[in-house]
Swiss-Prot record:
Enzyme Commission identifier(s): 2.3.1.48, 2.3.1.-
Region described as Disordered: 1-52
Assembly and oligomerization: Component of a multisubunit histone acetyltransferase complex (MSL) at least composed of the MOF/KAT8, MSL1/hampin, MSL2L1 and MSL3L1. Component of the NSL complex at least composed of MOF/KAT8, KANSL1, KANSL2, KANSL3, MCRS1, PHF20, OGT1/OGT, WDR5 and HCFC1. Component of some MLL1/MLL complex, at least composed of the core components KMT2A/MLL1, ASH2L, HCFC1, WDR5 and RBBP5, as well as the facultative components BACC1, CHD8, E2F6, HSP70, INO80C, KANSL1, LAS1L, MAX, MCRS1, MGA, MOF/KAT8, PELP1, PHF20, PRP31, RING2, RUVB1/TIP49A, RUVB2/TIP49B, SENP3, TAF1, TAF4, TAF6, TAF7, TAF9 and TEX10.
Protein name stated in the entry: Histone acetyltransferase KAT8
Posttranslational modification: Acetylation at Lys-274 facilitates cognate substrate Lys-binding and acetylation. Although considered as an autoacetylation event, acetylation at Lys-274 probably takes place via a non-enzymatic process following acetyl-CoA-binding, which primes KAT8 for cognate protein-lysine acetylation. Deacetylated by SIRT1.
Natural source organism: Rattus norvegicus (Rat)
Phosphoserine carried by residues: 37, 42, 348
Ranges where the MYST-type HAT domain occurs: 174-447
Entries under PANTHER family matching the protein: HISTONE ACETYLTRANSFERASE, HISTONE ACETYLTRANSFERASE KAT8
Catalytic EC class: transferase
């Protein structure tokens, strides 16, 4: 997590990108292979007149998730949804990432003995079947990948004391996600996390956003009126990349402060550890869009500090949920490294990475390195790879370690590969070529003048 005093608009974590073929939020991919989920049962009809348990804040109940499975969930908050005229409860599924927290109707909670008994009986049957299956051990690496894919939340006991304290403080501040969904462009999107929209905007169950200027509104009527008045059809700033229907705009946070602040508030709905939103001037934003006759529709973005003391080439990165698993996340990652190459520097995303961010970055780094190792003939060092790719040596070492392609020998890391091993990895869907790649010929960009002066002095 970024330090509280940091002047960062989006500097807390890198998140919200799902690699192609990787599960999105809520999808369950087990290490053991697909199996019937525990607690999956159609809700039985309670007996007539059967009393219900009163829902109390802070208590734990069985709750039916959108995939029809039942899980223990803590009730965090309640509200009356004025837009839909009903009482709702905000629940956190015990042991799951807070991304899956949601507002639910009362009828999704097991509040009668009939419903609780039916769910319990089904769970016991599942556990009995599971116990009869042969035991299968998983490696530490498999467990890590399983936890990342399935959004398994780390317990405080698994964190170091400093991280645990910061995590508890962050969770207390952002515990309740009031904005449950947004409407932007042609999409209605479920929010994943709390975002600090100002005043009563932040307490609305649903917000409407203009996809061009990113103005947010409480009411559909206001939104429809705005669409008829708004003159924007693309992000502000300068278009620096165009190929086919893919376009990227460079937006300076100092020149377009309101737009960038609105972008940060939008992004926070899908990023957990993003702590600062309004001091956007130290950042440059790169907005990825899909272009058609109506205009340039925002797909995602990444931001970077104008001057990063830690050598980060990305402060925050996000692909909006409707566009995930289509190659845009890796395109944004690749684009950030193309800028680093033009600056003649190496860079790395700001840490910590989210679970989805780790998967996408590791997949991208692996593909880039495997492509070079497949075609290269001769001696190649980790420093050489770093200069060729603008990926830091630490990121290269950790990636090669995950591929079993590096050994520590006589005080240094040595690349140890065979053509067969490289080809085997490249056949894996995890390391296949991204569906959308950056064409450097179409990139019209040069480093800022003050950076060009520094480069000329090197």
């Amino acid at each position: 997590m970024a330090a509280q005093g940091a002047t960062a608009a989006v500097a807390a974590t890198t998140s919200g990108i799902v690699g192609e073929g990787e599960p999105g939020p809520g999808e369950n991919t087990s290490v053991e292979g697909p199996a019937r989920s525990p607690g999956r049962v159609s809700p039985p009809t309670p007996a007539r007149g059967e009393p219900e348990v009163t829902v109390e804040i802070g208590e734990t109940y069985l709750c039916r998730r959108p995939d029809s499975t039942w899980h223990s969930a803590e009730v965090i908050q309640s509200r009356v949804n004025d837009q839909e005229g009903r009482e709702e409860f905000y629940v956190h599924y015990v042991g799951f990432n807070r991304r899956l927290d949601e507002w639910v109707d009362k009828n999704r909670l097991a509040l009668t003995k009939t419903v609780k008994d039916a769910v319990q009986k089904n769970s016991e049957k599942y556990l009995s079947e599971l116990a009869e299956q042969p035991e299968r051990k998983i490696t530490r690496n498999q467990k890590r990948k399983h936890d990342e894919i399935n959004h398994v939340q780390k317990t405080y006991a698994e964190m170091d004391p400093t991280t645990a304290a910061l995590e508890k403080e962050h969770e207390a501040i952002t515990k309740v996600k009031y904005v449950d969904k947004i409407h932007i462009g042609n999409y209605e999107i479920d929010a994943w996390y709390f975002s600090p929209f100002p005043e009563d905007y932040g307490k609305q169950p649903k917000l409407w956003l203009c996809e061009y200027c990113l103005k947010y509104m409480k009411f559909e009527k206001s939104y429809r009126f705005h669409l008829g008045q708004c003159q924007w059809r693309q992000p502000p700033g300068k278009e620096i990349y165009r190929k086919s229907n893919i376009s990227v705009y460079e937006v300076d946070g100092k020149d377009h402060k309101i737009y960038c602040q609105n972008l940060c508030l939008l992004a926070k709905l899908f990023l957990d550890h993003k702590t600062l939103y309004f001091d956007v001037e130290p950042f440059v934003f790169y907005i990825l869009t899909e272009v058609d006759r109506q205009g340039a529709h925002i797909v995602g973005y990444f931001s970077k500090e104008k001057e990063s003391p830690d050598g980060n080439n990305v402060a925050c990165i996000l692909t909006l949920p409707p566009y995930q698993r289509r190659g845009y996340g890796k395109f944004l990652i690749a684009f950030s490294y193309e800028l680093s190459k033009l600056e003649s520097t190496v860079g790395s995303p700001e840490k910590p990475l989210s679970d989805l961010g780790k998967l996408s970055y590791r997949s991208y780094w692996s593909w880039v390195l495997l492509e070079i190792l497949r075609d290269f003939r001769g001696t190649l060092s980790i420093k050489d790879l770093s200069q060729m790719t603008s990926i830091t040596q630490n990121d290269i070492i950790s990636t090669l370690q995950s591929l079993n392609m590096v050994k520590y020998w006589k005080g240094q890391h040595v690349i140890c590969v065979t053509p067969k091993l490289v080809e085997e990895h490249l056949k894996s869907a995890q390391y296949k070529k991204p569906p959308i790649t950056v064409d450097s010929v179409c990139l019209k960009w040069a480093p800022p003048k003050h950076k060009q002066v520094k480069l000329s002095k090197k």
